């Protein structure tokens, strides 16, 4: 327990690079002490029983782009919303969703409900000639995606901070055509209407991939794909991450994701 448990939690969640770990001992007493613990340093011993572990958010260091793998980047490389750390498409799911998109050499990719931008930005690292439209309605989302793009040295064609359904009801940003690939990660209660709007614009041989959390969402959206004449595939993505214990390692389950894929003939 204690400080060691906090550190294990950070490591297993991929957030160790996003926080400084401070230890406060005997706070308010004459012998109080505050210490910053480097990520690669062992915890000091002995620690006082009256102990507080404090996590202070920090911006991850700028990655060396040449040292990064081609895809499957660690979650901690991305800047994230400070009030929702860890709220992003995790590495294991990101790899599978990129595979499901079957990215072409060239074309237009829409990332709707882009979050931190992780999937669309990794797609640009794999296929630099793609034109990416990233849409995120959350306040500050566009600035976050642009900052992550700069860190990874890729350039989206457009990053828009708005509701995706409202955007598709109007004219597209300049320089962007209809999509060849769509990742539909947002929509909320309007997901059904959003999918209908996407299908109206999807090019022939285009692919739409929809990560979902519930069977009810699949039951609602799958018929729309089938009625529109798309070839439909459904997969469940499930992964576990090793989490260190005092005497070994346990496998901590990650949230399962249902990947609904439609391919236009």
Q: Model segments located where?
A:
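Conserved SAM-binding loop of SAM-dependent methyltransferases across substrates and taxa
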Residues: 116-128
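S-adenosyl-L-methionine
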Residues: 135-176, 190
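Short beta-strand element of Class I
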Residues: 129-133
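Conserved class I S-adenosyl-L-methionine
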Residues: 106-115
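C-terminal substrate-binding/active-site "lid" region of AdoMet-derived donor-dependent transferases
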Residues: 197-258
């Amino acid at each position: 327990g204690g400080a060691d448990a906090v550190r294990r939690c950070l490591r297993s969640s991929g957030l160790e690079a996003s926080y400084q770990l401070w230890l406060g001992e005997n706070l308010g007493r004459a012998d109080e002490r505050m210490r910053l613990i480097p990520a690669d340093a062992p915890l000091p011993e002995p620690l006082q029983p009256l102990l507080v572990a404090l996590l202070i958010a920090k911006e991850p260091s700028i990655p060396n782009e040449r040292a990064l793998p081609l895809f499957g980047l660690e979650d901690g490389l991305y800047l994230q919303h400070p009030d929702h750390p860890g709220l992003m498409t995790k590495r294991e799911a990101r790899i599978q969703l990129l595979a499901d998109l079957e990215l072409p050499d060239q074309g237009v990719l829409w990332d709707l409900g882009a979050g931190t931008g992780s999937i669309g930005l990794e797609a640009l690292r794999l296929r630099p000639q793609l034109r990416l439209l990233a849409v995120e309605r959350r306040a500050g989302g566009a600035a976050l995606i642009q900052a992550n793009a700069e860190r990874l040295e890729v350039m989206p064609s457009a990053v828009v901070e708005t509701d995706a359904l409202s955007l598709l009801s109007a004219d597209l940003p300049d320089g962007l055509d209809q999509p060849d690939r769509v990742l539909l990660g947002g929509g909320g209660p309007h997901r059904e209407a959003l999918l209908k709007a996407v299908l109206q614009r999807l090019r022939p041989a285009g692919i739409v991939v929809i990560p979902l959390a519930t069977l009810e969402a699949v039951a609602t959206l799958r018929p729309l794909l089938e009625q529109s004449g798309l070839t439909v595939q459904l997969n469940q993505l499930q992964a576990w991450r090793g989490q260190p214990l005092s005497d070994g390692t346990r496998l901590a389950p990650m949230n399962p994701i249902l990947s609904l894929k439609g391919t236009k003939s």
